[in-house]
């Protein structure tokens, strides 16, 4: 759960995506601390994955008591949005996407990371024809 922002990294002179992880209201201080720690731990684990089919995590930090994740900016649309707008994809494109996703999941598992929320909304179809897993359940 969270909001993703398009931002500029002045240090590295590049566009990035920044995700503010929104913690549910009404959590006790202990629950908030545990959720923040889990988010930071999961973001660090995701950053270990190196594969073109997995979004690259550049940094993770805390600001105003909320975790923030700095990631590669992906230009394109989610698979969910694409399907809602265009209907089913051609079989050849589905095969390409499936192969990419399996490669990304293989790389994640090799890094000891399990994607806990694979669904069309968490798969990006980029403008440069990549299929990319995002949001590892963080």
Predicted regions, residues:
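Activation-segment/catalytic-loop signature of the eukaryotic protein kinase fold
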Residues: 60
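Conserved short submotifs of the Hanks-type protein kinase catalytic core
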Residues: 64-78, 82
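AlphaC helix of the eukaryotic protein kinase fold
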Residues: 22-48
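Conserved N-lobe loop of protein kinases adjacent to the ATP-binding glycine-rich P-loop
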Residues: 8-16
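Protein kinase catalytic-loop region centered on the HRD/HxD motif
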Residues: 101-113
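Conserved N-lobe ATP-binding subsite of Hanks-type protein kinase domains
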Residues: 3
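Activation segment signature within eukaryotic-like protein kinase domains
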Residues: 97-98
């Amino acid at each position: 759960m969270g909001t993703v922002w398009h931002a500029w990294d002045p240090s590295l002179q590049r566009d990035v995506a920044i995700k503010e992880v929104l913690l549910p209201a009404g959590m006790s201080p202990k629950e908030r601390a545990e959720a923040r720690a889990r988010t930071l731990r999961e973001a660090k684990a995701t950053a270990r994955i190196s594969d073109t089919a997995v979004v690259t995590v550049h940094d993770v930090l805390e600001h105003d008591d909320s975790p923030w994740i700095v990631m590669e900016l992906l230009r394109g649309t989610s698979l969910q949005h694409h399907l809602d707008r265009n209907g089913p994809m051609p079989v050849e494109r589905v095969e390409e996407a499936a192969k990419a996703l399996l490669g990304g999941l293989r790389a994640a598992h090799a890094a000891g990371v399990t994607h806990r929320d694979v669904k069309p909304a968490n798969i990006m179809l980029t403008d440069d024809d990549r299929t990319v897993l995002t949001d590892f359940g963080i």
